[in-house]
From Swiss-Prot:
Compartments it resides in: Membrane
Region span, Disordered: 1-56
GO molecular-function term, one example from the UniProt record: transmembrane transporter activity
Keyword Transmembrane helix attributed: yes
Annotated source species: Acremonium sp
PANTHER family: MAJOR FACILITATOR SUPERFAMILY, MAJOR FACILITATOR SUPERFAMILY (MFS) PROFILE DOMAIN-CONTAINING PROTEIN
CDD domains: MFS_Azr1_MDR_like
Entry keyword Membrane: yes
Function per UniProt: MFS-type transporter; part of the gene cluster that mediates the biosynthesis of UCS1025A, a member of the pyrrolizidinone family that acts as a strong telomerase inhibitor and displays potent antibacterial and antitumor properties. These compounds share a hemiaminal-containing pyrrolizidinone core fused with a gamma-lactone, giving a furopyrrolizidine that is connected to a decalin fragment.
Keywords carried by this UniProt record: Glycoprotein, Membrane, Transmembrane, Transmembrane helix, Transport
Name of the protein described by the UniProt record: MFS-type transporter ucsD
Any one Gene Ontology cellular component term annotated for this protein: plasma membrane
C-alpha cells in the first residue's frame, strides 16, 4: 500500500483512494504501517532523512479547533484543582479539624483519579467518547460543589473523591479524543498545546488558592470550579460531536465490560495508595500498617495481570500492549519521566524554602523557570515529532538533559546565584518538556488503532502512578537523610523534630525562623542542603536508568493518517453520503 493512500480528515467529503477497495463497514481509512501482527518496523535513519514523509494535516476547520479549545479549557479546570488546594489546605484543616485525616484531602482526590481509568477506557469504546467526557466534567463540577459546601472533614474528603473520579475521566478522555482527531504523527503537537494550557492552571493554582483564602474564604477554592465547569460543559456539549460506536443493546455493552478484572485492579490500587499515603506521614515505613497494604496491593496488581491475560474475555489490559517491546519500554520510560518530573516539582521548592530561607510565595516565583518552562518545550517536542516522525532521539536527548540537570541541582547551596538556579531549572524544563507530549504517540506507534482507548488508559494510569512515587521516593530519602544527620546538631530540641521521620514538614522558612541560635540555624541549613544533595544523586541514578532503558525502544514508522471509528461525526456523515452517491452512480 502506498504510504499516502487512504483518506485524510479535511474539509469537505472524504474520498477513498481509488487504488484500494474498502469494505462496506469501513471507518475512516488509513495508511496502516505494516503492523498486522503488531510487529515493529525499524526506521532507517539515512533513508528517512533522505526522503522524509510528509504527514497530511488534520482538519483545521472551526469544528476541529473548537473541540481542541474546549478540551484545553477542560484541562485547565482539572489542572487548576490539582495545585490550588496546596496553599489553602492549612486553613481548611484549621476550620474543619479532622486530625491526621487531612492527608486524604489531596490524596483522596488523587486516588480516585487513577482507580477508574481502565474501566473508563473500556467503557469509552462501548458507549462513545462524548457522553463519558460530559459525565466526567459534570462529576468533577458536582464534587467541587460538595467540597465548597463541606461542613466536616469527612464531607470534604467525600467531595474530593467525587472530584477525583471526574478529574481522572477528564485527563483520560482528553488524550483519547485527541488520538481520535489527529494522526499518530501529529498527536504530540496538539497534546503539547493542551498541556501548555493545563500548565497555566497548575502555575496559577497556588497563587489563586492563597489569594482566595486570604481575601475571601477557602470555599471559593472549590466554588471557582462551578462557572469554569459549567462553561466547559456547554462548550463540549455543542462542539464535541464525534462518531458513536456501532449500535448494540445496553445488555450487550454491559456484558463486554471487564467488571471482575477492574474490581481486582481497583482494590489493589487502593491498597497500594493507602500504604503510600500512610507511610512516613501517619505511620513509620516499617509499620505493618504500611507494609501489609503495600504487599497486598502489589500482589493484587500481579494477580490482575494474570487474570487479564488468562481468564478475561474482554480484557482491559490486553497482552498486545505489555508484550510489545516498544510499547512496554515507553511505558517504563513514561513512569520514570513522571517520577523525575514530580521529583523536581516537589523538591526544588524545598531548596528555596529550607536552604535559601524563602517564603512559600517566593519559592513559587523562583520555580517559575521549572514549572512554566516545561510546556513551551512540550509544544516544540510535538512539532519536531510531526516534522521528522522520530521520537527515540528526542527521548534520549530529553532524558540525558534530565540526568544532567539532577547532577547540577546537587551543586546548589545557600550561596548559589540566581543565574545558577534559574538556568539549572530551565535546563531541566527543556529535557522534561521535549518528552512529555511525545511519550503517548511513541507508546501507540507499534499498536493497532483498535487499542487506542485501552492503551491510553494504561498510559494515563502509569503516569498517575509515577506521580505517587515521584513524591514518595524523594520524600523518604530526604526524611531518612535528615534523621541520620540530626544526631550531629548541637540543639537536641531541634534535632527531635528532624529525626522523627517527618523532616519534610519542617523544611520551611517558618521552622528556620523559629531557631534563634545562629549556629544551630546554620547547622540545620547545612543538614537540609546535604540531605537534598542525596535526593538529587538518587535522581541522577533514576534518570540515568531511564536513559539506558530508552535504547530498548524501536523507531516505528508513525502513521500519518487516521484509522478510527471515533472521528468527527460530520466527516463520517459526509463519507456515508459519498458512498451513497457512488452506489447510485453505479
Amino acid at each position: 500500500m502506498s504510504r499516502n493512500s487512504g483518506t485524510t480528515l479535511e474539509d469537505g467529503p472524504l474520498h477513498a483512494d481509488p487504488t484500494t477497495e474498502a469494505p462496506n463497514n469501513a471507518t475512516v481509512t488509513t495508511n496502516v504501517t505494516a503492523n498486522d501482527e503488531n510487529t515493529e518496523k525499524e526506521v532507517d535513519a539515512d533513508a528517512a532523512a533522505a526522503a522524509p514523509a510528509e504527514a497530511p494535516k488534520p482538519n483545521q476547520g472551526f469544528r476541529f479547533w473548537a473541540i481542541v479549545a474546549a478540551l484545553a479549557f477542560t484541562a485547565l479546570l482539572s489542572s487548576l484543582e490539582g495545585t490550588i488546594i496546596t496553599s489553602a489546605l492549612p486553613k481548611i484543616t484549621a476550620d474543619l479539624g479532622g486530625g491526621n485525616s487531612f492527608i486524604w484531602v489531596p490524596n483522596g482526590y488523587f486516588l480516585a483519579t487513577i482507580v477508574m481509568l481502565p474501566l473508563m477506557a473500556q467503557a469509552s469504546n462501548l458507549f462513545g467518547r462524548r457522553w463519558l467526557t460530559l459525565i466526567s466534567v459534570a462529576t468533577f463540577t458536582l464534587g467541587s460543589g460538595i467540597c465548597g459546601g463541606a461542613n466536616s472533614q469527612a464531607m470534604l474528603i467525600g467531595g474530593r473523591v467525587v472530584q477525583g473520579f471526574g478529574g481522572g475521566g477528564i485527563a483520560l478522555m482528553i488524550n483519547i479524543i485527541l488520538t481520535d482527531l489527529v494522526p499518530l504523527r501529529e498527536r504530540g503537537k496538539y497534546m503539547g498545546i493542551v498541556q501548555m494550557v493545563s500548565a497555566v492552571g497548575a502555575a496559577l493554582g497556588p497563587f489563586l488558592g492563597g489569594l482566595l483564602t486570604s481575601k475571601s474564604t477557602w470555599r471559593w477554592v472549590f466554588y471557582i470550579n462551578l462557572p469554569i465547569g459549567g462553561t466547559s460543559l456547554v462548550a463540549l456539549f455543542f462542539f464535541l460531536r464525534v462518531a458513536k460506536p456501532p449500535p448494540t443493546t445496553l445488555a450487550e455493552k454491559i456484558s463486554r465490560i471487564d467488571f471482575s478484572g477492574n474490581a481486582i485492579f481497583i482494590a489493589s490500587t487502593v491498597s497500594v495508595l493507602i500504604g503510600v499515603t500512610w507511610g512516613g506521614a501517619v505511620y513509620p515505613w516499617s509499620s505493618f500498617r504500611v507494609i501489609v497494604p503495600l504487599v497486598l496491593g502489589f500482589f493484587g496488581l500481579g494477580l490482575f495481570v494474570v487474570y487479564e491475560w488468562t481468564v478475561a474475555k474482554n480484557p482491559s489490559l490486553p497482552k498486545d500492549i505489555i508484550l510489545n517491546r516498544t510499547a512496554a519500554t515507553v511505558l517504563g520510560v513514561t513512569f520514570l519521566h513522571t517520577v523525575a518530573t514530580y521529583w523536581s516539582f516537589y523538591f526544588m521548592p524545598i531548596y528555596f524554602q529550607a536552604v535559601k530561607g524563602e517564603t512559600s510565595f517566593w519559592s513559587g516565583v523562583d520555580t517559575l523557570p521549572l514549572f512554566a518552562g516545561i510546556f513551551p518545550f512540550a509544544i516544540l517536542g510535538g512539532m519536531l515529532l510531526a516534522k521528522f516522525g522520530r521520537y527515540k532521539p528526542m527521548h534520549l536527548i530529553g532524558m540525558a538533559i534530565i540526568t544532567l540537570s539532577f547532577g547540577l541541582f546537587s551543586l546548589l547551596d545557600q550561596g548559589s546565584s540566581k543565574a545558577a538556579w534559574a538556568c539549572f531549572q530551565l535546563l531541566f524544563a527543556v529535557g522534561a518538556g521535549l518528552m512529555i507530549a511525545i511519550l503517548l504517540p511513541a507508546m501507540q506507534a507499534p499498536l493497532p488503532e483498535s487499542l487506542v482507548a485501552l492503551s491510553t488508559g494504561v498510559w494515563t494510569f502509569v503516569r498517575g502512578f509515577g506521580t505517587v512515587w515521584g513524591v514518595t521516593i524523594p520524600s523518604a530519602i530526604f526524611n531518612n537523610q535528615c534523621r541520620l544527620k540530626a544526631a550531629d546538631l548541637s540543639d537536641q530540641g531541634v534535632a527531635s523534630h528532624l529525626n522523627s521521620g517527618k523532616a519534610y514538614q519542617y523544611a520551611t522558612k517558618d521552622f528556620l525562623d523559629s531557631i534563634h541560635d545562629d549556629a544551630t540555624r546554620r547547622q540545620v541549613v547545612e543538614l537540609f542542603t546535604s540531605s537534598l544533595r542525596t535526593v538529587w544523586y538518587v535522581g541522577v541514578a533514576l534518570a540515568g536508568f531511564g536513559w539506558l532503558l530508552i535504547w530498548l525502544e524501536k523507531e516505528v514508522t508513525l502513521r500519518s493518517k487516521l484509522n478510527t471509528k471515533f472521528g468527527l461525526e460530520e466527516k463520517k456523515k459526509a463519507a456515508k453520503a459519498d458512498e451513497d452517491v457512488e452506489s447510485a452512480s453505479a
